[in-house]
């Protein structure tokens, strides 16, 4: 996408996250439970749990909440046996959308996801219909003004795969998703704190939306995001605010 919108988009995303912190905590608790159930309660030897715990810290979740979620996952308590299901579909003008869910009732979840797609101008696709348009990566975004040369040296030494500067001056670092925690630790040790650091499904190509189409696409994305069983929504659509 055009680099000018990178920084605006991430600031918008952070503001939206702050506005719905309670919902984010609920999602993180589910993810922590599942990660602990599948890989054990030690974040040092469980990369998925480490990532979830780091996200919880970034979201200012109390450590007691994190510990309880880990204990529930390890102990197999009621509510910890969520099923991971990915749905794929299309938004306005065929924009690609991936919806990752954790659910204890797949019939309810698929009905809710399908309803959101159909109500707001999209449609469900089949498994694999759009996932090939995305790459599973670790992504870091640094504020404009960050020293590009110093960051590039630190990032490549840490094991990152790509460093690029956007038109707005922000710098993006990409790495293999499995190397995310190691790269994050190395960058922070070198004095670089990312404004955004996440494992994500990054679209290979992006499509910008403006005007009415942008508003329609945002409504669809919001409807999917607001479903209780939804953990993450990924899209190749970029909403340009005019």
From Swiss-Prot:
Gene3D superfamilies: 1.10.10.200, 3.30.70.980. GO terms for cellular component: cytosol. Keywords: Cytoplasm, DNA-binding, Transcription, Transcription regulation. The keyword Transcription applies. The keyword Transferase does not apply. GO terms for molecular function: DNA binding. Its main location: cytoplasm. It is found in: Cytoplasm. It comes from the Bacteria. GO terms for biological process: regulation of DNA-templated transcription. PANTHER family: TRANSCRIPTIONAL REGULATORY PROTEIN YEBC-RELATED, TRANSLATIONAL ACTIVATOR OF CYTOCHROME C OXIDASE 1. Belongs to the TACO1 family. This is Probable transcriptional regulatory protein Bamb_2332. It comes from Burkholderia ambifaria (strain ATCC BAA-244 / DSM 16087 / CCUG 44356 / LMG 19182 / AMMD).
């Amino acid at each position: 996408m055009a680099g000018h919108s990178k920084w605006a988009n991430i600031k918008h995303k952070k503001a939206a996250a702050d506005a719905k912190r309670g919902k984010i905590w609920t999602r993180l608790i589910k993810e922590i439970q599942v990660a602990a159930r599948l890989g054990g309660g030690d974040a040092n030897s469980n990369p998925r749990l480490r990532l979830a715990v780091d996200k919880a810290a970034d979201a200012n979740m109390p450590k007691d909440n994190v510990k309880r979620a880990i204990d529930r996952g390890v102990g197999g308590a009621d509510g910890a046996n969520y099923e991971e299901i990915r749905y794929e579909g299309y938004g306005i003008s065929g924009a690609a959308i991936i919806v990752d869910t954790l659910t204890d009732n797949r019939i309810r979840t698929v009905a809710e996801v399908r309803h959101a797609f159909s109500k707001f101008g999209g449609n469900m696709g089949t498994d694999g219909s759009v996932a090939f348009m995305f790459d599973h990566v670790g992504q870091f975004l640094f504020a404009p003004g960050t020293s590009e040369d110093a960051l590039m040296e630190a990032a490549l030494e840490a094991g990152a795969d790509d460093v690029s500067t956007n038109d707005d001056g922000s710098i993006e670092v990409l790495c293999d998703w499995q190397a995310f925690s190691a790269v994050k630790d190395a960058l922070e040790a070198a004095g670089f704190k990312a404004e955004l650091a996440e494992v994500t499904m990054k679209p290979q190509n992006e499509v910008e939306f403006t005007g009415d189409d942008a508003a329609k696409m945002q409504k669809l994305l919001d409807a999917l995001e607001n479903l209780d069983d939804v953990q993450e929504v990924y899209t190749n659509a970029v909403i340009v605010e005019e």
